[in-house]
Amino acid sequence: MLASNSDGASTSVKPSDDAVNTVTPWSILLTNNKPMSGSENTLNNESHEMSQILKKSGLCYDPRMRFHATLSEVDDHPEDPRRVLRVFEAIKKAGYVSNVPSPSDVFLRIPAREATLEELLQVHSQEMYDRVTNTEKMSHEDLANLEKISDSLYYNNESAFCARLACGSAIETCTAVVTGQVKNAFAVVRPPGHHAEPHKPGGFCLFNNVSVTARSMLQRFPDKIKRVLIVDWDIHHGNGTQMAFYDDPNVLYVSLHRYENGRFYPGTNYGCAENCGEGPGLGRTVNIPWSCAGMGDGDYIYAFQRVVMPVAYEFDPDLVIVSCGFDAAAGDHIGQFLLTPAAYAHMTQMLMGLADGKVFISLEGGYNLDSISTSALAVAQSLLGIPPGRLHTTYACPQAVATINHVTKIQSQYWRCMRPKHFDANPKDAHVDRLHDVIRTYQAKKLFEDWKITNMPILRDSVSNVFNNQVLCSSNFFQKDNLLVIVHESPRVLGNGTSETNVLNLNDSLLVDPVSLYVEWAMQQDWGLIDINIPEVVTDGENAPVDILSEVKELCLYVWDNYVELSISKNIFFIGGGKAVHGLVNLASSRNVSDRVKCMVNFLGTEPLVGLKTASEEDLPTWYYRHSLVFVSSSNECWKKAKRAKRRYGRLMQSEHTETSDMMEQHYRAVTQYLLHLLQKARPTSQ
């Protein structure tokens, strides 16, 4: 028979392949164009590509998986049985499947089945299998008691059957991909699986569907499947999947998840970027741990372009499995992320460029029924070859960029595509110095030569020794009526290294130090000056990192109590940048500074707002609001909130810049003119 493409051309198609032509995008590819002259391999490749085009995509769904439910019919649990129904209904409404499998369906329906004991024991222990299976004969009272002592789990007498059905269906669907029955496939299954560890279930998960499937493919098809890539974009870290393959060199596990220093579920540090595998599997775990809520399309696409796809290409898998949770989708009350269906479609499309297109999608989480259905439909359409929609955001936020930079530094030890290889920045030899110490030594020397600015002694055990030589002061600040206290982070060093090493070209490297503008200005005004530099890393006596914010707060209190408060200065001005702002705001909350401090100018960039302690005296927030300028990047999350920021955060000023150093330089003239204006107003009362 003949099928028409979008240009009206006709193409010969076998009768057995008739149903596939109901998908418009495929017919566009079926042209009569002949290959250009070339090798026989070119013809063979095109023949292979044509066979892939003619294959259908697979889909597995069985309504019996909805039998797994809470004991109480009125219990509104997020892992709702309707989740799989809504996904299937969305795909059916789009015209890709029907209730009763039909040859005319766009998707080839894969029959569901239960996983066997032998298959499950490839990942899980016999004890865990028995624990789940025993629930089939438990009374409601025993099931309720088991739920109380379980980790985010519920059971009824059908739960074990549904878990076996979900896992077996995943295996069967993936088998169809590996054997070439379909070109790719989507298993709409529940309960989900990626939190189920080898020895215990947890987090709504009974058996680990993806892990059992991956292990089954490796063992059943050793000639075809030697390397498996598992990409887990569920918003939670897949602790069970990572544990199952942590020492396996043949499985690359990549997880993008909300982490927040281990506070987000599953609530451990197992999903941190530093956990990269062990033994022969070292480097085969790639964790991308997002630091906060609100990540969106641009952040995930950035992660895919910078980490996921480069590592995946280098790994060169024979099969791609996706732990496809939709709880990072916009509207999900648990995830609180902002991914659109287009983002899921784009990520799916990128993965389809691997492993000759052998991609298997297995449903995991996702708890907003509208979000999960629209997102799943977008993934299904990508599997069919339909181009993705447009992204909502096309760039990554600063927090995402910071996370990806951290991940690439760690993974550069294991992947050539992540070069230059990250080096150990902890000096161990006597002839090695940290650059921030070298720069501070240079600054101290230059400031002494230009303005006779010297080191201020820090004589207190509670303040880290790292701050020695980091606090400088003008020689006569005690006797000055006007005093400027600047607390800032180390200056930036901009430079380019070689492509294979971390060696900087010093001739092309620059030191960017906007604080020097304020120092020079204060000295020209004949003011007193205290310059406090905050290193990026603060350590204790044994060179172990400590909480930098606590140390900054302690240092600011020390300088105030032992130096500033004892001076004769009547007009004191604070300038803070980055993490240093925490120290100044804490000082204003902890000491009576309002009589002498005329203004606090803080530069925060994209960092979260820093407010006075909530227990502060009643009129202090009002004083702070009236005596502060807080420059915040226009891309800061605070501007997206409907409510106006409270006064305890100070008087907020928008800046077009994101880096605090850029902001300090850009607003230098406005700030210094404002300080002079305040000084002029203060003079009649101070004389």
UniProtKB/Swiss-Prot annotation:
Coiled coil: none
Active site: H195
EC category name: hydrolase
Biological process, per Gene Ontology: chromatin organization; epigenetic regulation of gene expression; pericentric heterochromatin formation; rDNA heterochromatin formation; silent mating-type cassette heterochromatin formation; siRNA-independent facultative heterochromatin formation; subtelomeric heterochromatin formation
Cleaved signal peptide residues: none
Catalytic activity: N(6)-acetyl-L-lysyl-[histone] + H2O = L-lysyl-[histone] + acetate
One MF annotation (Gene Ontology) recorded for this entry: histone H3K14 deacetylase activity, hydrolytic mechanism
UniProt entry keywords in alphabetical sequence: Centromere, Chromatin regulator, Chromosome, Hydrolase, Nucleus, Repressor, Telomere, Transcription, Transcription regulation
One Gene Ontology cellular component annotation held by this UniProt entry: heterochromatin island
Function recorded in the entry: Responsible for the deacetylation of lysine residues on the N-terminal part of the core histones (H2A, H2B, H3 and H4). Histone deacetylation gives a tag for epigenetic repression and plays an important role in transcriptional regulation, cell cycle progression and developmental events. Histone deacetylases act via the formation of large multiprotein complexes. Required for proper positioning of nucleosomes at heterochromatic loci and for transcriptional gene silencing (TGS) function of the Snf2/Hdac-containing repressor complex (SHREC).
Protein name: Histone deacetylase clr3
